[in-house]
Structure formats: structure tokens, C-alpha cells
Design a protein with these regions (language model features):
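Donor nucleotide-sugar binding/catalytic pocket of nucleotide-sugar-dependent glycosyltransferases
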Residues: 120-161
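A short, charged, and often flexible helix/loop element on the N-terminal side
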Residues: 35-62, 72-83
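Nucleotide-sugar-dependent glycosyltransferases with a strong bias toward membrane-associated enzymes
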Residues: 17, 83, 182-186
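Nucleotide-sugar-dependent glycosyltransferase donor-binding/catalytic pocket residues
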Residues: 13, 158, 175-178
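A short, histidine- and acid-enriched strand-loop-helix "catalytic/donor-clamping" loop
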Residues: 75-79, 95-112, 126-127
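N-terminal subdomain of nucleotide-sugar transferases
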Residues: 1-42
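Membrane-proximal helix-turn-helix segments that form the acceptor-binding/catalytic region
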Residues: 86-93, 111-127
Length: 186
């Protein structure tokens, strides 16, 4: 079985990427593929952020020769810049690269200030994972003629045992926008 090095923000950081990686960590595939989580970022001041990045790079370079695949979870802006460093190193070591794209909005795909680094990260990947079919549309619109190997991977959620007797409640906590898919709940 190939071994997977997972590059993502810290377990102690709040947000979607941390939640997704924590959910994957509880799945059987985590053990099956001998996954190891490299924590590249933590909320806090600049010193803490630089410390996390520096220690993550050292750990990553030490472990990378023993792994086959690098699975990079990335958001936008600074996250893309950080993860480009890890992707370039993986390329030097001839590792397969999976980029798991978790952006908050599609607008940066079309913004010249950010789109170059995003495009470069996508080009380095062997597989690009996105959160919904809509993201495939936006990426294809932003980077026409791309040759990305894109696949949708929905965010995991824990299994829940349902009681036979239940009341009907709908709770939606989040931003009401089309990209979040609230219209599919109702």
C-alpha cells in the first residue's frame, strides 16, 4: 500500500480544512495508507505562524523519502503560497501530488493577483480534488484548456445512529450562498 503524507493546517486551527482532515483521520483509510499529518500553519501571531511553517518543512523533508504520495489540503491566498513550497519539494523527490482544494470563494480563481500561484499549484498536481461539481466548472472557466485531473470529493461527515422515533427539524448553520448548497437541503 502506498504511504500518504498529508500536508494541512494544524489540528489546533479552527476551520473547514482541519475538520475535514480530522474526519479523514478517523477513517480506516488513514491507517490503511499509513497517513501522517504535517501541520503547516496555526492561528496566532507571525512568530507562531513562521515557527509552524519552519518546523513543518523540517519534518516534511525528513519524512518525505519514506512516503509515496503527498496529499496537500489548500485554501486560498497565503495557504496557496505555503503549499507551493511543499509541492515543489515533493516534485523534486518525484512524489505523486494530490491537491485538495478547499477555497471559501471562487473569485480568487479569476483575480490576477492570486490566480497565477493557484494555477501553478494545480499544474504540479497529479490529481486535483474539489468539493463539488460547481468547482470543476469554475476552474475550467478560469483556466480554459487546462489538463488537470479533477475529481469531486465531498467533505466527510461522521456516521450517526438514528433513533426510530425522531422529530423533524432542519438546522442550517453557515453562509446562505449557492456554493454552499443550501438549496439541496430543502
Amino acid at each position: 500500500m502506498p504511504k500518504v503524507l498529508v500536508v494541512a493546517t494544524s489540528r489546533k486551527t479552527k476551520g473547514g480544512i482541519t475538520s475535514v482532515v480530522k474526519a479523514h483521520e478517523t477513517g480506516e483509510q488513514w491507517k490503511k495508507f499509513h497517513c501522517k499529518w504535517i501541520e503547516t500553519h496555526r492561528d496566532g501571531n507571525s512568530v507562531r505562524k513562521l515557527w509552524y511553517l519552519a518546523t513543518a518543512l523540517i519534518e516534511y523533508i525528513c519524512l518525505l523519502p519514506f512516503y509515496d504520495i503527498v496529499h496537500i489540503h489548500v485554501g486560498l491566498r497565503t495557504s496557496v503560497n505555503r503549499k507551493l513550497i511543499f509541492a515543489r519539494i515533493a516534485l523534486l523527490f518525484r512524489k505523486k501530488i494530490i491537491v485538495h482544494f478547499h477555497p471559501a470563494t471562487e473569485k480568487h480563481l479569476f483575480d490576477p493577483m492570486f490566480s497565477g500561484n493557484i494555477k501553478h499549484l494545480f499544474e504540479l498536481s497529479n490529481k486535483l480534488l474539489v468539493l463539488s461539481p460547481k468547482w470543476i466548472e469554475w476552474i475550467n472557466e478560469a483556466y480554459r484548456g487546462n489538463k488537470y485531473n479533477i475529481q469531486v470529493l465531498y467533505n466527510p461527515c461522521p456516521s450517526v445512529k438514528r433513533s426510530i422515533q425522531r422529530e423533524n427539524y432542519i438546522l442550517y448553520a453557515g453562509i446562505l450562498s449557492d456554493r454552499k448548497g443550501y438549496n439541496r437541503l430543502i
